[in-house]
């Protein structure tokens, strides 16, 4: 769909305008130590490879896409700091996460392009009504600075944030979104442990909004509103089957 609202909103989805094939690989180790109770920090490394082919005619003429090669390797180093009080990383029902990540990519590290990525994230979880009933709210922003390749631009619209949009449709140098989500599992903890089928089932409902812009400022006047519901089946503790609409 291109980069930025002006380009994205003008392009209709079709095989001849938006379809392309992306092959990618990423090695992203992070080394984290707890320096104080709930406070974690450490270095990280990112090596990622991306290749784009079967390019559609519209994409082949996109000026931002054509600034970069069709395949490249990016190599970056950085650090992270997190304050994490969640009672469970996979399926938390209480606590919070505050996270800040900074990464620097460069030709001097062996990569193809010079750019920086910054990320701030806030997650809060609160039990409501009864056990296995959780209210969660999330806010996140990513900022890219420098010569950020098209496939690495900050974006929203994926199974991990604002669900329902085509993956990677909304991308630019800066991205921000917020989500309010209610999660409900049927039955009690005791019924789940006893193997009761309905106690393994639940649902979610969410509302959210996101925007993009040219770094470091997002376009505060062009928010995309998002909402939906979903089914959850807990296959094992901390592991859910998800179906969202």
Describe each region flagged by the PLM:
Residues 11-13, 57-64, 117-119, 152-160, ...:
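Flexible, surface-exposed loop regions and adjacent strand-edge segments
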Residues 81, 222, 234-245:
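Predominantly the C-terminal beta-signal and adjacent terminal strand-loop region
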Residues 50, 62-67, 75, 130-132, ...:
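Outer-membrane beta-barrel transmembrane domain signature
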Residues 1-11, 43-49, 96-104, 120, ...:
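Transmembrane beta-barrel strands of outer-membrane/channel proteins
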Residues 19-23, 69-73, 90-92, 112-114, ...:
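Short sequence motifs at beta-strands and strand-loop junctions characteristic
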């Amino acid at each position: 769909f291109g980069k930025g609202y002006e380009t994205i909103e003008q392009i209709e989805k079709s095989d001849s305008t938006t379809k392309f094939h992306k092959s990618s690989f990423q090695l992203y180790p992070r080394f984290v130590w707890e320096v104080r109770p709930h406070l974690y920090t450490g270095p990280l490394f990112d090596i990622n490879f991306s290749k784009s082919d079967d390019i559609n005619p519209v994409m082949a003429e996109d000026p931002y896409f054509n600034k970069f090669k069709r395949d490249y390797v990016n190599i970056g180093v950085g650090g992270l700091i997190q304050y994490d009080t969640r009672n469970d990383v996979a399926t938390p029902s209480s606590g919070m996460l505050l996270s800040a990540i900074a990464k620097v990519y460069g030709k001097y590290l062996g990569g193809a392009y010079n750019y920086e990525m910054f990320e701030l994230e806030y997650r809060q979880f609160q039990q409501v009504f009864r056990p296995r009933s959780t209210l969660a709210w999330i806010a996140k922003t990513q900022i890219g600075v420098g010569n950020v390749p098209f496939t690495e631009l900050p974006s929203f619209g994926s199974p991990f944030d604002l669900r329902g949009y085509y993956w990677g449709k909304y991308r630019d140098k800066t991205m921000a979104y917020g989500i309010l989500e209610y999660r409900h599992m049927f039955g009690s903890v005791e019924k789940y442990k006893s193997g009761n089928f309905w106690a393994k089932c639940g649902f979610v409902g969410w509302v959210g909004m996101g925007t993009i812009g040219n770094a470091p400022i997002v376009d505060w006047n062009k928010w995309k509103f998002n909402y939906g519901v979903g089914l959850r089946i807990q296959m094992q503790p901390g592991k859910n089957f998800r179906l969202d609409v």
